[in-house]
Amino acid sequence: MGGKKFGTNSKAEEARSKKAEVKKNENEKKQRDKEDKMWEETDTKILDKQKKQKEKEEKAREDAKKKQEAKELLQQEDKEIKERYGKPSDTKVTRFEIQQKRDKEQKQREKELASRPSDPRVVVVPTTTTTTTTTTTTTTGSDDHEEEDFNLEENMNHILREQRLKDGKDVIDARDINEAIGALSGNDGKEQHPERRMKAAFNAYEEENLPVLRKENPSLRLTQVKQLLWKNWLKAPENPFNQVGSQ
């Protein structure tokens, strides 16, 4: 009689196969580790060189990152300048140079206005820059040192306008230099630019009369005295606009 035959246990066979695979992988890993250890660098000089090279590469990456951030920041500033002034800026030009260029253009427009015959009806009211005069006075009272600013240019234009209206004459308002140039006409022989002498004339008048008014009104503050000085100046013969009105 033949021997008894038994079927194969599939689960046991699968377990043995997995166990053999795990053992094989472990042996391969040990072999790789052994080979890697054989090739591992142990020379301290070479190790230091590798370390420095790694640090150099990291520094280069950090510098590149900072450079990119600075570039993006500059682009953002240029965008803001473009939105504010309506035109792109040259990244090689500083803000100081941009302001210098604007000041130069303004002076050129003023020079062009001054070189043309003017119409006394034109009153220029500046919208960008103003001229102020500062007077410092020392007294023996409680206000030992007072300093006040008068906007001479603004007052000068208002006085010219008020005096011409009071005299029944025409007045042409100009908000900037370009408008004033467009309103200019021929010269009739009279002085057409009393405003050119206004600042110097007022300074001389103030220097001469302010100490007198301070002495005559010791109880008034400097601001009040200067207001009184200004009222007197409006009627003073030294005022160039009064000289124009008498011509």
Swiss-Prot record:
The entry assigns this protein to a family as follows: Belongs to the CCDC124 family.
Taking the record's annotation, the residue ranges forming a coiled coil are 8-85
State the name under which the record lists this protein.
Answer: Coiled-coil domain-containing protein 124 homolog
Tell me, what does this protein do in biology?
Ribosome-binding protein involved in ribosome hibernation: associates with translationally inactive ribosomes and stabilizes the nonrotated conformation of the 80S ribosome, thereby promoting ribosome preservation and storage.
* Compositionally biased intervals (Basic and acidic residues): 11-114
**Subunit composition?**
Associates with translationally inactive ribosomes in the nonrotated state.
Asked if the keyword Mitochondrion belongs to this entry, the reply reads no
The cross-references to Pfam families, in alphabetical order and at most eight, read:
Ccdc124 (PF06244)
The segment annotated Disordered runs over: 1-146
The organism's place on the tree of life at top rank = Eukaryota
Q: Name one GO molecular function term.
A: transcription coactivator activity
Q: Which GO terms describe its cellular component?
A: nucleus
Organism of this sequence: Dictyostelium discoideum (Social amoeba)
Composition bias of kind Low complexity appears in: 122-140
Which BP terms from GO are recorded? transcription by RNA polymerase II
